[in-house]
Amino acid sequence: MRLLLLNGPNLNLLGQREPGFYGAMTLKAIEADLLAQAEAEAVQLECFQSNFEGALVDQIHQAIGQVQGILINAGAYTHTSIALRDALLGAAIPYVELHLSNTHAREGFRHHSYLADRAVGVVSGFGALSYRLALEGLLAHLRQPQQVL
C-alpha cells in the first residue's frame, strides 16, 4: 500500500514557528517518525511539503492511480483553498485532514475547513501525535472500509 503525506504552507518552519501552538518538533522529525510507523505497517509513505498551493494540487493530481490514501495538513490553505478541495475530490483518493493545533480553539477564521466534509476523518489538536493518529485512522479505513470505526 502506498500513501502520500502533504504538508502546506509554513510547516517547513515547525520547531521554530509559534511552538506554543505547533510544538518543538521539526517537520523532518515528524516525517521520520511517521515513515517509521508506516514501515512497521508495511506501507510506503511519500512526504511532500510546499508553500505553494499549485504545487500541492499538482502532487494530488500525480497521486491518482499511484496511492491509496492521502494524509493532508494543508495549513492555512485548509480555510481558503477551493482548489485543494477540488483536486482532492477530483482525485477520488480517500484522505484524512490533520492539524497540529486544535483549529476550533483558535481564531474564528480557522474554524471553517474546505476539506473536512469530504475527508474520511479529521485529527487536530494533538501536536505531532496528530500525524500518527491520522495515519492509524486512514489505515484502519483503507483496510476495513465497510466497518464503522
Curated annotation (Swiss-Prot):
Q: Origin, by domain of life?
A: Bacteria
Question: E.C. number, please?
Answer: 4.2.1.10
Enzyme group, top EC level? lyase
The active site is formed by Y22 (proton acceptor), H99 (proton donor)
Catalytic activities: 3-dehydroquinate = 3-dehydroshikimate + H2O
CDD domains linked = DHQase_II
Does the keyword section mention Zinc?
no
Annotated SUPFAM superfamilies: Type II 3-dehydroquinate dehydratase (SSF52304)
- Signal peptide location: none
* Binding-site residues for substrate, renumbered to this chain: N73, H79, D86, L100, S101, R110
Sites marked Transition state stabilizer: R17
Output the GO biological process annotations, alphabetical, semicolon-separated.
Answer: amino acid biosynthetic process; aromatic amino acid family biosynthetic process; chorismate biosynthetic process; quinate catabolic process
Q: Which PANTHER family match?
A: CATABOLIC 3-DEHYDROQUINASE (PTHR21272:SF3)
Could you describe the subunit structure of this protein?
Answer: Homododecamer.
Family membership:
Belongs to the type-II 3-dehydroquinase family.
Protein name per its UniProtKB record: 3-dehydroquinate dehydratase
**Provenance organism:** Prochlorococcus marinus (strain MIT 9313)
- The gene name on file is aroQ
